[in-house]
Swiss-Prot record:
Zn(2+) 3 binds at residue 154. This is Alpha-crystallin A chain. InterPro entries: A-crystallin/Hsp20_dom, Alpha-crystallin/HSP_16, Alpha-crystallin/sHSP_animal, Alpha-crystallin_N, HSP20-like_chaperone. Zn(2+) 1 binds at residues 100, 102. Heteromer composed of three CRYAA and one CRYAB subunits. Inter-subunit bridging via zinc ions enhances stability, which is crucial as there is no protein turn over in the lens. Can also form homodimers and homotetramers (dimers of dimers) which serve as the building blocks of homooligomers. Within homooligomers, the zinc-binding motif is created from residues of 3 different molecules. His-100 and Glu-102 from one molecule are ligands of the zinc ion, and His-107 and His-154 residues from additional molecules complete the site with tetrahedral coordination geometry.
Amino acid sequence: MDIAIQQPWFKRALGPFYPSRLFDQFFGEGLFEYDLMPFLSSTISPYYRQSLFRTVLDSGVSEVRSDRDKFVIFLDVKHFSPEDLTVKVLQDFVEIHGKHNERQDDHGYISREFHRRYRLPSNVDQSALSCSLSADGMLTFSGPKVPSGVDAGHSERAIPVSREEKPSSAPSS
């Protein structure tokens, strides 16, 4: 398959509005036509319409939900096992770190690492926080909220990541 190279003026003019998979966690998995020219991908293949924002949503973007009763973080970590993940609570923040050492895949050797930090709402019960990894690679971090005026127990501690055998119930983008 020949891939047309986009012109520099095109890249400069539309680049900020059409992010590429080149710099996300899928680096090294190969390129598609829409990675190089997302705006023109429908003209190259008129019967196939690729969402212009698909690459942003598929690049490990997390989803944070905070409702009246609980706080939940969904994070796609499909390239990591529970042993590769560290989840810590440091005062009002949760830090999620994933790293796996260099290993061989279809295209050569690859290593991955990420670090995410989220602020916890002040009324989250930090003694009841939990973290699980679904079979499809969705990390779910959650904690119940306590009524206002009740001490939520802020301290530093590690949260173990448990493995679930069923796929995640988180909405897919």
